[in-house]
Amino acid sequence: MGKLIGRISICLLIVCSFWAGTVISDRQRLGEELVRLHVVAASDEKWDQELKLRVRDAVSESLRSDLEKIRDAGEAKRYLQEKLPYIREVAQSTLRFFGCQDTVSVSLCREVFDRRVYDTFSLPAGVYDALRIVIGEGQGKNWWCVVFPGLCIPAASVGTVAVAAGAGFPEGLNNTLIGEAGYELRFGILDAMGKLENVFFGE
């Protein structure tokens, strides 16, 4: 009986170790293979918040066709780094079109993000690469999503899965992000790991 319990314990330990390893791999993949889009409004005034969304739409649309052809996060980051002056020009021109004279700063950087829930998927907390666009003084509310892969474009979960899979995300991670039944614990652990990562990153 004792030997049986020992064997069962060893089997459970192996299974748990494998499962934990896949969760850690998912956390690393999220941090390395997603590029978030972070647009910061000049203020919380209604018009500044509207301008933030106009800039978001203009920048997203200007990059969409090129980013859809990219299947590697490293290539996407290099592309965005090279395009920073162009992105700034798109954002600046959008503001000018609507009569706003605010300046715009654009950068590709590492940022701390809280857990976010979108229409078709959720992202756990953690440190991510981000295309950061700051309008004016940058004192207003933020808009966060994902610029690569284009997870914020599809209107349905099936679209989200297809886009994520095209970027090389494994099925388990896709199911975790769209909230498939049975993956809640996995998402919770990813979120907890991300929050811990945020604490150390902020030190």
Model-derived segments and their meaning:
Residues W19-E33:
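Aromatic-capped interface at the extracytoplasmic side
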Residues E32, R36-K69:
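Short extracytoplasmic
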Residues R56, S60-E68, P85, E89-R96, ...:
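Sec-exported extracytoplasmic/periplasmic mature domains
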Residues G6-V23:
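Hydrophobic membrane-insertion alpha-helices, especially the h-region
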Residues T120-Y183:
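Soluble extracytoplasmic domains of inner/organellar membrane proteins
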Residues K69-Y79:
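Internal, well-folded beta-alpha domain core
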Residues G179-E203:
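Short flanking/linker segments adjacent to small metal-binding domains or redox-active Cys/His motifs
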Residues K77-V146:
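Mid-length scaffold segments of soluble, non-membrane domains
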